[in-house]
Amino acid sequence: MMQSESEFRKGYNKLTEKQRAELRFWAEELSHYVEWYQGRRRTLYKTPCPEENGQNGVPQLHVSAILTWAKLHQCPKYLHDLQLTKDAFRGLKVLDVGSGPIPSATCFEGADIYALDPLAEFYESIGYSRTPFPDVHFCEAKAEKMPFSSHFFDVVLSVNAIDHVDDFEQTAAEISRVLKPGGKLAMHVHYHPATECEPLELNDSRVRTAFSSVKGFAPCRRSQCSFTNDVLPPEEFVLWRNF
């Protein structure tokens, strides 16, 4: 249920400065999606604006922009960055850690999707409706303390989000806990200097140590290019998987 204005203000005052910065970022992104959808931005994160026949066309402009952005950018981004196909997890229970306001893991057809983010309720209040995603389980919780029983998920994913958490090692422990024995883990990780919204400086050693209990979890692809961004060394995008 979306927060009332008073609830939003009360909750907002309790957020950390990092969380407030993230909300400001996503509010600005929504305005960019609308500009892109209307053709006032010819490209956004390498993705050309849609032709009229490629637009979603629901009555609410911002919702139509979000759905079109999800279809043309977010879902292809997940498949590209994770190097997976849309039927990879059919029939499986999938957790997306740090899903953000758009549940991009819906790109995996036939999967039971859980979208975990500590700001989930706030996203609704700044314009990101859940209504177009009735089959997604939205969970407002920190990755360091997940509200799931042990061995609950067949698959755990994270795409350019694990560097946003406050406690990386505790997050890794929680991911390992909720993943079924022999379950699948895939993370697309950005190695970069710390920023306000992305305070963690990760590297192979730290990731490998934190996930040492997940058998076979290892880097399988490195690049200075993701579906969204290009970076310069020493920054890089690293895909980690155990399958």
Describe each model-derived feature in a short phrase.
Residues 155-166:
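A short SAM/SAH-binding and catalytic strip from SAM-dependent methyltransferases
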Residues 91:
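Phosphate-coordination loops involved in phosphoryl transfer and adenosine-cofactor binding
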Residues 169-184:
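A short glycine-rich, Lys/Arg-flanked "PGG" loop and its adjoining helix->strand segment in the class I
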Residues 221-243:
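Core SAM-dependent methyltransferase catalytic element
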